[in-house]
A protein has these predicted regions:
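Bacterial Sec-dependent N-terminal signal peptides
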Residues: 1-4, 16-70
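Conserved, mostly hydrophobic/aromatic
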Residues: 96, 138, 181, 243, ...
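Surface-exposed amphipathic alpha-helices with a cationic face
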Residues: 66-70, 121-137, 141-142, 203-218, ...
């Protein structure tokens, strides 16, 4: 019996280990290793995910800017770029989106963001002394290489955190009222932007962390394509306050650039109304949509691809365009266009009449407001911005 006992004891220990029982007390002198005692266990506790797969809860709670910090409604938002010379007149504006903020390293989306001509931004923010209700946001991104870095940043947890912290630093340093994100577009856009199939989900991770970082006293807005594709709106709207719908660039000649309503003969894909409706169906309430108005048009020979509104007066007065500058009005689409003597569509654009219809649409549909791209494309008299303001506010000033 005594010679058999060690073997029996070892068998008992083996059975206990197999069954997952701790034998530190049951078998004197033997301790089952725990994870802390395992010298090969080098995993850290709660590592920060880097794949963007488990940062979103299944039932996220809405986290938005407090109402008192959103600014005046209806909104009239001007995009104002670093290429501008004259400062904007804030009298008919409620918000200004200063463009552009860009990634420090656009190839990788790393290093946070930077601003070209920060001294100009400071002058724009100083307009709040003249009009205290004015809100100034920093627009980050844009089309083409201006959007470089978004996809690479959004898929990496460390870069997301750095991006959000950099946004907060700029908000604090300059006294900004928020951030306008112009990622064109998650999962789409030029291939050189590094687009990725997970962009849509990763975008929500960016929004969530940005909200957590800047808090509920600052605005988060997004410049959306005329199409409601690319974004998971039901989740995104839990973190962003409103959407600037870019209801333009919807057609080149012989099609309208930004038709208010669908006109079968000369509307390419969709109208402004269809775009607003599509965003609503996708989960963006009408009272959180800001309708885009282009202060430019699209042309074909003899015109440039892009024609600013402040160039239109010269087009009508110059002999260079004689016989090719005949204004037509599309009574269905509610926009003008130019044709030649044979009736060929040469230039689609917006003018005072069409902008008035669009401002009235904002009021009729109870939208949050209107925005326009861009301030410097208006003429020196402010013809378009004043027409937009008058259609929405009943006067050429937003002062109530």
């Amino acid at each position: 019996m005594c010679k058999l006992f060690p073997a029996v004891r070892l068998l008992a220990v083996a059975m206990l280990i197999f069954l997952g029982a701790s034998c530190s007390e049951d078998v004197p002198g033997f301790v089952v290793p725990t994870p802390d005692d395992n010298k090969d266990n080098t995993q850290t506790e709660n590592p920060k995910p880097d794949d963007g797969k488990d940062d979103l809860t299944e039932e996220p709670i809405a986290n938005l800017c407090d109402e008192e910090f959103l600014g005046q409604k209806p909104m009239i938002i001007a995009y104002y770029t670093e290429n501008s010379s004259a400062l904007p007149d804030p009298s008919c504006l409620t918000h200004i989106n200063y463009a552009h903020g860009r990634f420090v390293d656009k190839e990788t989306g790393d290093g946070g963001i930077w601003i070209e001509k920060p001294e100009l931004l400071e002058k724009v923010i100083a307009l709040k002394q003249q009009k205290p209700s004015l809100k100034v946001l920093l627009m980050i991104g844009g089309w083409g290489d201006k959007a470089d870095g978004f996809s690479m940043m959004a898929r990496d947890a460390r870069k997301r955190t750095l991006f959000c912290q950099s946004c907060k630093e700029h908000i604090d340093n300059y006294g900004l009222d928020g951030i306008d994100i112009d990622w064109e577009y998650p999962t789409a856009g030029p291939s050189e932007n590094g687009r990725h199939p997970d962009d849509t989900r990763n975008f929500n991770l960016v929004l969530k962390e940005l909200r957590e970082t800047i808090g509920n006293t600052k605005i988060i807005s997004y410049a959306s394509s005329a199409s409601a594709d690319y974004v998971d709106w039901k989740t995104a709207m839990l973190y962003m306050d409103y959407v600037n719908v870019m209801t333009y660039d919807m057609g080149d000649p012989p099609y309208h650039n930004a038709p208010l309503y669908y006109s079968a003969a000369i509307t390419r894909k969709r109208s402004v109304d269809q775009s607003i409706t599509q965003h609503f169906a996708a989960g963006v309430p009408l009272n959180r949509q800001v309708m885009g108005v282009p202060f430019y048009g699209h042309g074909t020979d003899p015109y440039k691809d892009d024609v600013k509104f402040n160039e239109m007066a010269g087009i009508f007065s110059s002999s260079k365009y004689e016989g090719k500058n005949i204004r037509k009005w599309d009574s269905v689409a509610k926009v003008p266009y130019l044709v030649d003597e044979s009736g060929n569509f040469l230039l689609g654009y917006d003018d005072q009449e069409s902008v008035t219809y669009k401002g009235q649409y904002v009021v009729q549909k109870n939208l949050l407001g209107a925005m326009f791209w861009e301030y410097r494309h208006d003429d020196s008299q402010g013809t378009l911005r004043k027409a937009l303001c008058k259609a929405i506010y009943g006067s050429e000033s937003t002062t109530k």
